[in-house]
Amino acid sequence: MDLNQTDWKKNNEEDNESIIIDVRTQEEYNLGHIKKSILIDINQPDLFMESISNLDKNYSYYVYCRTGNRSDMACSLMNQNGLKAYNLVGGIVEWKGDIKKN
């Protein structure tokens, strides 16, 4: 499901069983990422599918990438695997919240 930034952030903050997933590359993640996010690179399809198969289906997953395209694809795959995944429309380039840099 696609959510705008306001709803994505609000729903994530109100959800006690949520995890933020960044589906960009390691290099992009190192340049800056949303606080408390974990990296699962969708550009590594085998590793991505293995990683999502190990995720807890009781949690909600708030997913983002640079502009929202890769995260949209990731959410589709995650939803097909029985996970509740929410795409950040516009991605990190439109994010107005805090960014953590490595």
Question: What positions do the PLM features span?
Answer:
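Rhodanese-like catalytic fold shared by cysteine-dependent sulfurtransferases
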Residues: M1-S18, Q26-S60, R66-N102
